[in-house]
């Protein structure tokens, strides 16, 4: 399929799940924990997981003025995230028992979703910036975003 062969519906996850369950949409592109919930609770099957097609990253963001005036806080926050990541990764069951109720999922589904994540927050590498730029350019070419953006211009580069 090409982009022009499909009709996109931009829905928030809860609305998208309802549309998927009722057959209002034929397919659903979604991330964890929603994908794990759809497989476990709705009987959905994963058609493509994105491995090799698109890398999935999570980003922590701050305003430019904040990052310029408080780099020490951001550095500390990044280290604390790494510490928490290590704990979560080595205590998936306990983490799922905490996260599951917060997102309205059974512990086993939350544990499956947590098991899919890549842990270990790090600063953006040049490789990640290049990949994100390619994606941003594709979105711009498809007119999914209103104008071209420069990914590198918004990446935090702390002073060493």
Where are these regions (language model features)?
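A local structural motif
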Residues: 1-12, 22-26, 107, 145-152
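Short, contiguous strand/loop micro-motifs
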Residues: 3-4, 21-22, 83, 122-123
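Proline- and acidic/polar-enriched loop/turn elements at helix boundaries
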Residues: 8, 32, 51, 112, ...
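Pocket-lining segment of extracytoplasmic ligand-binding domains
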Residues: 14-101
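Short secondary-structure boundary/hinge segments and terminal tails
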Residues: 38, 55-57, 117-118, 155-158
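Residue-level signal for threonine
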Residues: 63, 125, 156-157
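Secondary-structure end/capping motifs
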Residues: 68-144
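Conserved C-terminal helix/tail region of periplasmic/extracytoplasmic solute-binding proteins
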Residues: 137-160
């Amino acid at each position: 399929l090409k982009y022009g062969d499909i009709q996109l519906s931009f829905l928030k996850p809860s609305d998208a799940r309802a549309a998927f369950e009722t057959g209002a949409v034929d397919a659903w592109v979604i991330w964890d924990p929603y994908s794990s919930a759809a497989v476990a609770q709705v009987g959905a099957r994963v058609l493509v997981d994105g491995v090799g097609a698109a890398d999935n990253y999570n980003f922590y963001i701050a305003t430019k003025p904040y990052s310029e005036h408080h780099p020490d806080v951001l550095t500390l926050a990044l280290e604390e995230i790494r510490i928490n990541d290590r704990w979560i990764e080595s205590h998936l069951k306990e983490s799922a028992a905490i996260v599951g109720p917060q997102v309205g999922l059974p512990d086993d589904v939350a544990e499956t979703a947590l098991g899919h994540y890549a842990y270990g927050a790090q600063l953006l590498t040049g490789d990640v910036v290049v990949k994100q730029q390619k994606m941003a350019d594709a979105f711009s070419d498809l007119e999914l975003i209103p104008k071209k953006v420069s990914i590198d211009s918004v990446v935090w580069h702390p002073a060493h």
